Amino acid sequence: MIVMVHVACSENMKKYFENIVDEVKKIYRIAEECRKKGFDPTDEVEIPLAADMADRVEGLVGPKGVAERIRELVKELGKEPAALEIAKEIVEGKFGNFDKEKKAEQAVRTALAVLTEGIVAAPLEGIADVKIKKNPDGTEYLAIYYAGPIRSAGGTAQALSVLVGDFVRKAMGLDRYKPTEDEIERYVEEVELYQSEVGSFQYNPTADEIRTAIRNIPIEITGEATDDVEVSGHRDLPRVETNQLRGGALLVLVEGVLLKAPKILRHVDKLGIEGWDWLKDLMSKKEEKEEEKDEKVDDEEIDEEEEEISGYWRDVKIEANKKFISEVIAGRPVFAHPSKVGGFRLRYGRSRNTGFATQGFHPALMYLVDEFMAVGTQLKTERPGKATCVVPVDSIEPPIVKLKNGDVIRVDTIEKAMDVRNRVEEILFLGDVLVNYGDFLENNHPLLPSCWCEEWYEKILIANNIEYDKDFIKNPKPEEAVKFALETKTPLHPRFTYHWHDVSKEDIILLRNWLLKGKEDSLEGKKVWIVDLEIEEDKKAKRILELIGCCHLVRNKKVIIEEYYPLLYSLGFDVENKKDLVENIEKILESAKNSMHLINLLAPFEVRRNTYVYVGARMGRPEKAAPRKMKPPVNGLFPIGNAGGQVRLINKAVEENNTDDVDVSYTRCPNCGKISLYRVCPFCGTKVELDNFGRIKAPLKDYWYAALKRLGINKPGDVKCIKGMTSKQKIVEPLEKAILRAINEVYVFKDGTTRFDCTDVPVTHFKPNEINVTVEKLRELGYDKDIYGNELVDGEQVVELKPQDVIIPESCAEYFVKVANFIDDLLEKFYKVERFYNVKKKEDLIGHLVIGMAPHTSAGMVGRIIGYTKANVGYAHPYFHAAKRRNCDGDEDSFFLLLDAFLNFSKKFLPDKRGGQMDAPLVLTTILDPKEVDGEVHNMDTMWSYPLEFYEKTLEMPSPKEVKEFMETVEDRLGKPEQYEGIGYTHETSRIDLGPKVCAYKTLGSMLEKTTSQLSVAKKIRATDERDVAEKVIQSHFIPDLIGNLRAFSRQAVRCKCGAKYRRIPLKGKCPKCGSNLILTVSKGAVEKYMDVAEKMAEEYNVNDYIKQRLKIIKEGINSIFENEKSRQVKLSDFFKIG
């Protein structure tokens, strides 16, 4: 059944894979036995098992027998050359002789499947057709018809599919595509129309770039219509079958060929393909334009005037990237404006729950921002990528806040955050964001200067052979930090290195003069520095103290500073000897180039710059953990038409003796003469063939009672079914399955499976206590040692996660208990075999197998449940997420039980429309090979600490590739046993599920509540401008919604309670079918729902006049439609002014 593919791994890991494969075989055999009984659309399990990429490609697109050859070619040549070679061999007829067009189509699909690891649906759904067409001169050329789902392949694979097309064209001896001027201009028009009417591309090409590309690409990039928008200029062209937008073709042209031009050129050079040199000219023209625009290096620029200042002190100007904040959604807060002081401090490193696009934040902050950040919440970020997922890391710098009584404190624990959250006046610093080197490498974003942190400090001490205490690095005392710096001549400890760079030189002198008026005293047995807070000048100085992030208390108009030792020494005052170390402050001030230079002239030791880069972020999607339901939710894929009413209840239809016409495959049983919708007659048990297809009266009553009789059930309660099948053959699912799902309170998806969706979060190491599993159970599952090689005996030991093990949300575990009970009922009552799961509580699920799957793919990945978490996320190894072709930037995927998929999935249920085969397990991977997963994970770093060279090099803002020589990533481990084990991380976290579990966005009710809370958060964050937030919410969310709803109201369809829908109101004003009154599909409330909120927001935050005027115009438009002025009788004299 399964060929065990050799992967480089240890004996322990090999045993783990073998156990998974054995369990898959066992479950497969159970499903095979059940399917042979004939109650399902086919007698076989419809999910082929694949041990590797080659198997997946053959299972997904074929041709038969290609897997072995793919393995040989990939081993010999590598993935990309192998894809081209396999395409050539298909064209040559080595895998079957069929007509020319079919060969070309098979070659392109198979090559694209190899390029996308046989995971995504693009080779099946993204290529609608491949044709051989004629040029005006009579020569033949190749045309690839792309469809919308080609998006799932990603830009690089889209571009390479065009390269494959060219390769196939040459192999078949075809000429190149010769476009007419009208066809060229049609592409220009379509790109512009798509951007104005449908959506934006990742790249915005010029008209000349499009013209150059179309003239030079050797095949025709065309496609089927994907949008209802029609071109107005270049219509009815002989070789273009539609006047509508060809979205798939445009994606391939813009986000494939033009955006990924550098990658195409690399492959062209590597593979020796001719005819693509025009891309070099296109790129050089683009580079020239960029040089003309500005002399900046990408977004980053070093201020040349400051070059003369020593590297650690200089000001580095990094241009803010404002793209992430171009639109703000109502109710979802902005946490920091682009690069604004007080935002997230960039810190390099990886915790056991970060990496692969997920970033770490201090859990205390999550409570301080009113729980709008929870575990798994998506953030749209300024850099290095476009988005990330929030996870807690409590070993990084916490937020610093100012309380309403004037105190400034570091909120370094969740308990402290909960205590002060209602007393916070201002969040001065949001704390660190932990970003791993791999994310910069993946996004090819220049490395930005590292913050001054404990890891860098420790590396300096090690490099200089200076002895130190580990506790001193983590938690130094103020006096100890000063003494250590003076004695060892090293920079001051990061803990007491304040944000001097965020205030001016004059501010520093003002602060110094004020502090020196104070005195040393004791408070509650501790030495403190006390300064008066009386006059306006004192208040200005206190504000500077706040801005540099120095903690202090305010009592009786006095400022009390506990960590005064490093503060005063940094300002040139010897606390120990009560002596001012500065003789001529005016001269020093004059000679200082900037604030950091001034501090270093004042202090008796080196003071490093605390922060070079502040990162902006806003909330994206909230985290998700919920059962997958169709709209509306149904229990089974059994069609009942409109017989069950709006709620689609078959039991109600049976009770009321209702029926309706449905399109189905059926036959008349030769034995009992009754109509059978199944391959086994439900009334007499005779095996039949469904040889008829058409519209019949649904025999609901007969089927209902036959199903109840077979299951031995009297009254199952409400059972929700579908109105009609969307599949091609309209083969129905047995009604018994719907009844059993309803009894167990579970729902069905379009393909017959029962799924649970949750946000993807990576984890490489865990503690047994975090995932609610006993040490004994973990030892049974093969976890017997911790990361230090010690025997696993305690729930707090850190253990490395195996690549196919998953930790599901608690709510998922509870749902899967119901699903397992449904499967067992199905086995026992429907298939008449033994129960399998025998699950009573969620702990019983541990050790069972699931399938993990992403919506844009057609290949599932086998996983094993090893625990559950209270967080609303699905934890899995980064490899597991990558095997689904996902990263972890806030996306969600689904889990479903393996036996559920084997028993209930059928291709016969899949919708007969473009994209219908996406999100369906058309093939299943049993063994995870890191070489065959999404390449993004290969950039994730695997080190236990970053070297000193890395931190030093970041100051030069190099390309991440320039430091690769002293960094280790997953790529360096591929093909070795270490690819699975011994992966390191740099920062610890107490628990992977610290912080709020549910984002406030989901708990708040009305939009008014959400926007009020959103702006309340903005008000208290120093790095956020609440007026700008209000303006952006109104402009990018409310105004487009109001206009769109107004337009929708004027174009709306109407419906009737009988289920009929009409594009326009019928002339008689009532439903022609039943005579009932018609109902609007867009109500007045839907049109004006945001109007009041927008007006209140505009008034309260005094947004600009332009926005206020736009709102006024929209309101007038709404009133003109919905005004209902009572008519009144008027006399002629009313129109005259009577004196």
Swiss-Prot record:
Any one GO molecular function term: DNA binding
InterPro entries per record: PolC_DP2, PolC_DP2_cat_dom, PolC_DP2_central_dom, PolC_DP2_N
Keyword match Calcium: no
Listed EC numbers: 2.7.7.7, 3.1.11.1
Pfam families in the cross-refs: PolC_DP2_cat, PolC_DP2_central, PolC_DP2_N
Reaction equation(s) it catalyzes: DNA(n) + a 2'-deoxyribonucleoside 5'-triphosphate = DNA(n+1) + diphosphate; Exonucleolytic cleavage in the 3'- to 5'-direction to yield nucleoside 5'-phosphates
One GO term of the biological process aspect: DNA catabolic process
Keyword terms: DNA replication, DNA-binding, DNA-directed DNA polymerase, Exonuclease, Hydrolase, Multifunctional enzyme, Nuclease, Nucleotidyltransferase, Transferase
UniProt similarity note: Belongs to the archaeal DNA polymerase II family.
Subunit structure: Heterodimer of a large subunit and a small subunit.
NCBIfam families: polC (TIGR00354), PRK04023.1 (NF003103), PRK14715.1 (NF011303)
Role, per record: Possesses two activities: a DNA synthesis (polymerase) and an exonucleolytic activity that degrades single-stranded DNA in the 3'- to 5'-direction. Has a template-primer preference which is characteristic of a replicative DNA polymerase.
Name of the featured protein: DNA polymerase II large subunit
The organism of origin for this protein: Methanocaldococcus jannaschii (strain ATCC 43067 / DSM 2661 / JAL-1 / JCM 10045 / NBRC 100440) (Methanococcus jannaschii)
Taxonomic classification: Archaea, Methanobacteriati, Methanobacteriota, Methanomada group, Methanococci
Gene that specifies this protein: polC
